[in-house]
From Swiss-Prot:
GO CC aspect terms: plasma membrane
Residues spanning the membrane: 17-37, 60-80, 91-111, 137-157, 173-193, 212-232, 239-259, 274-294, 311-331, 338-358
Keywords: Acyltransferase, Cell membrane, Membrane, Transferase, Transmembrane, Transmembrane helix
Membrane topology listed for this record: Multi-pass membrane protein
Keyword Transmembrane helix recorded: yes
A GO term for molecular function: acyltransferase activity, transferring groups other than amino-acyl groups
Entry's Gene Ontology BP terms: glucan biosynthetic process
Role, per record: Necessary for the succinyl substitution of periplasmic glucans. Could catalyze the transfer of succinyl residues from the cytoplasmic side of the membrane to the nascent glucan backbones on the periplasmic side of the membrane.
Localization terms from the record: Cell membrane
Family statement drawn from the similarity comment of this UniProt entry: Belongs to the acyltransferase 3 family. OpgC subfamily.
Pathway assigned to this chain's UniProt record: Glycan metabolism; osmoregulated periplasmic glucan (OPG) biosynthesis
UniProt protein name: Glucans biosynthesis protein C
């Protein structure tokens, strides 16, 4: 069994927090991009579209690698049932809390903003269910995927641990070239599965719950397991924390391919399948770029960094309805896209931090948005002197 490191790896905490917080400029730039969203500016911005595409091309792949890393670390710390319970509580409770408090009001607001409130009664029962699935899960989809992955990894992590106990761990080494080939094959495999579903029964791909539970889990599970393997094998982790010009160049070329596919691809042809292959290998190479950068610059402890590490999930959860509110009611009054983008950042981040500070002072909300029980310190119980 792999021992749990005594020293906290601050750069991974920081990277995870920054990836979470990158969701704010990602969604605000989406308003000003050429991509169709719930709310859009009058004229799209080429540079904000490029910025949006860059974040979207790798952010969640790297995030799930870090999630897998910490999940396996906790897997070794707790008994199996307690591990599953702790992990599911920490992602499931915030997700279930955010649905009635955040995404339901967000959905109601959008119904009126987009003029769809009048047509809602005329929808079929399935259309109502599917619309609610997409709109209520919304930006919480990664929490649902983490619940599914944690449940699957009850079996997967047990198999990994049993195989380690019956084999020589020192001989299990992979080069970045070998990992690239593996992830290329995984991307092609995912593309084949998606194309097969598209041929056999295309309507299922527009089903919200199927998309989140099956397709998103299927795509990101290799990154989650890669994170676990990086925790187990120091050599694998070193592949990602050691700067590689090859990975940087390959990631840059893959991003160009991603942009070309976005520009010239067609949803009726092979655009989505091509994107899955590109983003699978791009995500792998960006793990090296992000980890090596973070290991060099973010591997330290500070009160300010710790604050945003702790606040990142809450800020991410509340930023989405704030962003849509800004896009619906404030964006139309700002003619400059870049000024609107900067104002959006100030508006969303400012209010999110205020809400975070308020929720810290309400124990029930603090529990509901973190999934962690509030533990009173012994000093708090001591009588005043």
């Amino acid at each position: 069994m792999n021992p749990v490191p005594a020293q906290r790896e601050y750069f991974l905490d920081s990277i995870r927090a920054w990836l979470m917080l990158l969701g704010i400029p990602f969604h605000i730039s989406l308003i000003y991009s050429s991509h169709t969203w719930h709310v859009n500016s009058a004229e799209p911005s080429l540079w904000l579209t490029l910025f949006n595409d860059f974040i979207h091309s790798f952010r969640m792949q790297v995030f799930f690698v870090i999630s897998g890393y910490f999940s396996y670390m906790l897997f070794l710390r707790y008994p199996l049932k307690k591990w599953w319970k702790v992990r599911v509580e920490r992602v499931g409770i915030p997700m279930l809390t955010a649905i009635p408090l955040l995404t339901l009001p967000q959905f109601i607001m959008l119904q009126y903003v987009k003029g769809k409130a009048e047509s809602w009664p005329g929808l079929s029962l399935y259309d109502k269910y599917n619309t609610l699935a997409w709109e209520l899960i919304s930006h919480l989809w990664f929490l649902l995927v983490l619940v599914v992955m944690t449940t699957l990894c009850v079996w997967i992590f047990k198999r990994i641990r049993n195989n380690l106990e019956n084999s020589d761990k020192t001989n299990k080494k992979f080069s970045m070239v070998k990992l690239s080939v593996i992830f290329l094959c995984l991307g092609i495999g995912y593309a084949v599965i998606r194309r097969t579903i598209f041929i056999v029964y295309p309507p299922i791909l527009s089903n919200g719950m199927f998309n989140f539970i099956v397709m998103q889990t299927l795509f990101y599970l290799p990154f989650f397991i890669l994170g676990a393997l990086a925790f187990i094998f120091p050599h694998h982790k070193a592949l990602f924390t050691t700067p590689s010009r090859g990975c940087t160049l390959a990631a840059a070329l893959a991003f160009v391919a991603y942009l070309l596919n976005q520009r010239y691809g067609s949803g009726d042809a092979w655009m989505y399948e091509t994107e899955s292959v590109i983003t699978m290998v791009l995500g792998l190479w960006m793990v090296n770029v992000v980890f090596s950068f973070g290991h060099r610059l973010l591997n330290f402890q500070s009160a300010r960094v710790t604050y945003f590490v702790n606040a990142s999930l809450f800020i991410y959860l509340v930023h989405h309805p704030l962003t849509l509110f800004f896009g619906a009611y404030i964006t139309p009054h700002i003619t400059s896209n870049w000024l609107g983008f900067l104002c959006g950042l100030i508006f969303v981040v400012g209010i999110a931090i205020i809400l975070y500070e308020i929720h810290l002072r309400i124990p029930l909300l603090k529990f509901l948005f973190s999934g962690k029980p509030v533990v009173k310190r012994e000093n708090d119980k001591a009588p005043a002197r």
